[in-house]
Amino acid sequence: MDKNQITRRAFLAASTTTAVLTGCASSQKPNTAKVVPGKVSPNQKVNVACIGGGGKGLDDMMNAKKAGANIVAIADPDWNRAAEGFYKCKDAKQYKDYRVMLDEMGKDIDACTVSTPDHTHAPAAYRVMKLGKHVYCQKPLTHTIAEARLLRKVAQEAKVVTQMGNQGHCQVGVRELCEMMWSGVIGDVKEAHVWTNRPIWPQGIAAPLPAEPVPAEMDWNLWIGTAPERAYNSKYAPFNWRGWWDFGCGAIGDMACHIMDAAFWSLNLIEAETFTAQAIVSEGMTDQTPPLKSTIKIDFPARGKMGPVSVYWHDGGILPTRPADIPADQKIGDGNNGSLFIGSKGYLTAGEYGGHPRLLPDSKMADYKKPAPSIKRVSHNDPYYDWIECIQNGGKTASNFDYASPLTVVANFGNVALHAKGEPLIYDVKNGKVTNNPKLNALLTKEYRKGWELPV
């Protein structure tokens, strides 16, 4: 190994490896029959299998069902967590290992939801798409940048219908925000701020938690999936995994695909060939967990007719400085979450999902007429209807992986910047590399536990 190369786990106290996906608990050969988009009749229900059946998995399951899907199978390593989903979809076959489910039921499945902790998104979605199945994957799309690039590539090759679960992207508010921005009402935007009240789970923890007995209903080995082995503790699952590097992506990973979406879309950041990220504030980060609070500055060069812009991410209670000409009694964003765009002619703000966009100060909205709609609205303003209808009729969803992957890359690169401890890092979008500190490219991927590897 080149002496300048270090591993992600060297930062997080381990080592890295890559290989081809080989893991499957069943020896049965996976079914590879391909479901062609648009070949499921609009009058025919889409057979959906759910990877993750509790919490957000239950939400995704029931929303897919509401949109017209037929839930045929549910896989979850924690059957206590999945119990409500099992009850509400009694006819669905029940599994602990989604790989066994796909092996045994591949021919009966058209599509899958992936609603698992971040670290297992990519292996599940990868396997689903390799079988020619459509996929709805929760945000952030992946745990690492390399995984995000891989899933985009595989989705293009498989020609399947994909959707990431940043539901605000399908709603009217963010579309109105883009139309307002593109009308030029606030002029040239050189600075934007995005913030969240997350983390609402513990972070800043220096060591793994002590071992506890594994609940009888849980297969802890399956839950760990790709991550290095560690003892079970109830403070990892089912929720607080978000605050552990091995399982989650911290506050920016959890929320940027929601809150930063408005900036990413309206400022056309997807067109940037490079960008630079720097951690301005980082308090309490450890090898085990993300920081208690952070501010990350991400600089994007000019894109088409749009000039350079700096986007600031704030979490852990940090808020952007209120502009002097916005009265103190006027809300910016939703308060604890939101975005603020600072233009040469004024200000534009929006809520958590890009909703309720409005000019500031409030007086600017008194006589303002929003532009006529120019962006297509999504069926029912709903990502699940969008996904199911595109499976039946063909076409691309709003947050398909060609969009979701680059958005996830920006969010995950914020975490890479946190590990650089204040050093500005330059990212080459086309080649997927850090250009000014190559040793940090190890942080764009991760170690995979044997049996769960991906070709990244």
Which positions does each model-derived feature cover?
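N-terminal secretory signal peptides and thylakoid transit peptides that target proteins
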Residues: 1-19
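N-terminal Rossmann-like dinucleotide-binding module
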Residues: 18-89, 168-171, 181, 263
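Short, solvent-exposed turn/loop segments enriched in Gly/Ser/Thr/Pro and often Arg
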Residues: 78, 115-120, 141-143, 148, ...
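Conserved SAM-binding strand-loop segment of SAM-dependent methyltransferases
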Residues: 93-97
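Short amphipathic alpha-helix with an adjacent loop that forms part of the alpha/beta core around
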Residues: 100-107
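N-terminal Rossmann-like NAD(P) cofactor-binding module of classical short-chain dehydrogenase/reductase
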Residues: 111-113
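Beta-strand-loop-alpha-helix segment that lines the small-molecule cofactor/substrate pocket
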Residues: 117, 122-170, 184, 422
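Contiguous beta-strand/loop segments that form the cofactor/metal-binding neighborhood of enzyme cores
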Residues: 176, 188, 193-195, 202-249, ...
